[in-house]
Amino acid sequence: MDRELERLDQEITLELQKIDGNLSHCFDVITKQVIPRVVAYGQVCDAISDSCEWLGTLCKSSGVVDLKRDVLLERTPVRDSDAHGNAHGDTHGNAHGDAHGEANAERSYGDVAGGEEHNSTVQSEVSDSTMGKYREDDTREQGEDDSVQRQKKRKVSLLIQERYGSSSSVMPSPDKRVPQQSLGSSPVKEQVPLPGTVIHFSTK
């Protein structure tokens, strides 16, 4: 009976030693492997949380802040100093530029006026020469028409003379009609020859 108890006691002791060894091993694993990894993971999570919080703050701030106004406020001192420096330069430059611009404007106005006067003179000369040419052409055409009409009339008169005799034989002159010796005689005794027949043709 005692031997059985001793044997059981030894077996229990061995089992407890094994359990203690396993617990020690588990403790070592947890202490040396798990806990450092958990700590590292916690640090990473903290960094992620901080980053997310910073991003959230940045988004909120960017939604509220007026960037243009801030930039203008930052650049205002520089612009004020530049404006004071440019005011004197602009005043002097504008005065000189205005005087130069007025001189250029007067010169341009004179050039334009001279150009318009020259153009009007040239146009008047061209119009006068053109009108003179048209008048010469009209005069020439009118002279040609008159010469053609005269030629037609001359041809008609020549045809009449050829057909009915000369104009002197058609109508005798007053000298041939009344002889000089019969001027003092009675008109009853003297017989005046009858005039010849005269035919008139239109020469239109």
Curated annotation (Swiss-Prot):
GO BP annotations, alphabetical order: cell division; mitotic sister chromatid biorientation; positive regulation of attachment of spindle microtubules to kinetochore; positive regulation of microtubule polymerization; protein transport along microtubule to mitotic spindle pole body
Record's compositionally biased regions (Polar residues): 120-130
SS bond list: none
A single cellular component GO annotation: mitotic spindle
Subcellular location: Nucleus; Cytoplasm, Cytoskeleton, Spindle; Chromosome, Centromere, Kinetochore
Biased composition (Basic and acidic residues): 78-119, 133-142
Gene Ontology molecular functions: microtubule plus-end binding
Record keywords, A-Z: Cell cycle, Cell division, Centromere, Chromosome, Chromosome partition, Cytoplasm, Cytoskeleton, Kinetochore, Microtubule, Mitosis, Nucleus
Main location: nucleus
Sequence segments annotated as region (Disordered): 78-204
Family matches, as Pfam families: DASH_Ask1
Role description: Component of the DASH complex that connects microtubules with kinetochores and couples microtubule depolymerisation to chromosome movement; it is involved in retrieving kinetochores to the spindle poles before their re-orientation on the spindle in early mitosis and allows microtubule depolymerization to pull chromosomes apart and resist detachment during anaphase.
Family assignment from sequence similarity: Belongs to the DASH complex ASK1 family.
Subunit structure: Component of the DASH complex consisting of ASK1, DAD1, DAD2, DAD3, DAD4, DAM1, DUO1, HSK3, SPC19 and SPC34, with a stoichiometry of one copy of each subunit per complex. Multiple DASH complexes oligomerize to form a ring that encircles spindle microtubules and organizes the rod-like NDC80 complexes of the outer kinetochore. DASH complex oligomerization strengthens microtubule attachments. On cytoplasmic microtubules, DASH complexes appear to form patches instead of rings.
Protein's UniProt name: DASH complex subunit ASK1
Gene: ASK1
